[in-house]
């Protein structure tokens, strides 16, 4: 995403000030949702949330609260969004960063979040003589307290972590769309490995949404070109990367989420496509019958809300977030100022 620097700098300053005054989500194993009478918690088709300056890119479902969690690109927070549209901050700002992809690990009572000062650095809002702030954080799901902040650096001058997932062993995987990498981090916070492949490389936006499959491999989407990869043996010294052959490749792949039935929800937008607007916003559902060597399109739905970025799987449907990121990227005012939307597909 290449922001219009002057306009975007004004926008981020304004949004950060507003906040001071006041972001593919799948764990292993896949959740087995059951809407029993005691668990029933109906959600509206669309939640329009008033939150000036929040601008979420990532969303996750919190099964304990039966509520959504959203990150803030402008304020560096993680907030709880309840079924009535009310919002409260759970994780307070811990640095001048964007919180991008987030994931709930209910088994370990934690939230994982990719964070980066990429946008602030690009806009000259942080001291660029200092090293970039870029990493993956773990936070207490109950209290929001910081458990650990793990710097992730591969030597890039402007790294940008994007999405995060956790496997059944507790290892954390975070994508970097500028470094074109996937980094594996132990649950204790040690950087264990950086996974690279020539096919991850992009002139624009590279590795993006990522999910851990219960069978032990990863699925990762590359934004540019809409390519999907399966990474086998990600905990070994030599992971094996295979491209998933799609019947219809989308123009881009942003957020991903695995559903309990094994299908994969893919969010498509034109936020980072060359030239900006001109692509399409869509939500695509893919299914594989051969362990994600190939996949076919079950549904390709043009999305009615602008600039969707990712999706949260809940017991009550799959909810896609439209956080108004184009305003941060271009400085052009949102058509729904001070609001973001969560909509069921």
Segments from the language model and where they lie:
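Beta-rich, blade/repeat-based domains predominating
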Residues: 51-65, 94-119, 153-172, 199-218, ...
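A short beta-strand motif characteristic of beta-propeller blades
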Residues: 44-49, 86-92, 147-153, 192-201, ...
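N-terminal secretory signal peptides
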Residues: 1-7, 16-27, 32-33
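Conserved beta-strand positions in repeat-built beta-propeller and related beta-rich domains
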Residues: 52, 62-63, 69-74, 105, ...
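Beta-propeller blade signature
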Residues: 132-140, 283-288, 335-345
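Asp-box/WD-like beta-propeller blade repeats and closely related beta-sheet repeat scaffolds
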Residues: 130-167
């Amino acid at each position: 995403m290449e922001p219009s620097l002057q306009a975007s700098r004004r926008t981020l300053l304004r949004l950060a000030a507003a906040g001071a005054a006041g972001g593919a989500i799948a764990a292993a194993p896949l959740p087995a949702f059951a809407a029993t009478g005691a668990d029933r918690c109906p959600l509206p088709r669309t939640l329009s949330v008033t939150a000036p300056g929040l601008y979420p890119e990532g969303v996750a479902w919190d099964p304990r609260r039966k509520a959504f969690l959203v990150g803030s690109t402008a304020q560096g927070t993680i907030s709880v969004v309840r079924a009535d549209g009310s919002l409260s901050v759970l994780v307070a700002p811990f640095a001048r960063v964007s919180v991008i992809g987030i994931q709930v690990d209910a088994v370990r009572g934690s939230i994982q979040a990719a964070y980066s000062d990429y946008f602030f650095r690009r806009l000259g809002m942080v001291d660029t003589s200092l090293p970039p702030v870029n990493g993956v954080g773990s936070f207490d799901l109950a209290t929001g307290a910081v458990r650990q902040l793990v710097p992730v650096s591969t030597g890039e001058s402007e790294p940008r972590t994007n999405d995060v997932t956790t496997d059944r062993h507790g290892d954390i995987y975070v994508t970097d769309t500028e470094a074109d990498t996937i980094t594996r981090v132990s649950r204790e916070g040690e950087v264990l490995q950086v996974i690279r492949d020539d096919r991850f490389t992009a002139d624009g936006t590279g590795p993006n949404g990522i999910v851990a499959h219960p069978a032990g491999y990863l699925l990762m989407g590359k934004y540019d070109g809409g390519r999907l990869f399966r990474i086998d043996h990600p905990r070994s010294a030599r992971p094996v990367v295979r491209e998933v052959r799609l019947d219809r490749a989308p123009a881009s792949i942003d957020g991903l989420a695995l559903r309990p039935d094994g299908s994969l929800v893919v969010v498509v937008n034109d936020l980072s496509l060359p030239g900006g607007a001109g692509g399409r916003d869509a939500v695509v559902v893919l299914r594989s019958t051969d362990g994600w060597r190939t996949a076919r399109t079950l549904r390709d739905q043009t999305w009615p809300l602008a600039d969707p970025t990712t999706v949260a799987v809940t017991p009550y449907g799959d909810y896609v977030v439209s956080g108004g990121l184009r305003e941060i990227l271009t400085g052009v005012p949102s058509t729904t100022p001070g609001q973001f939307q969560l909509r069921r597909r």
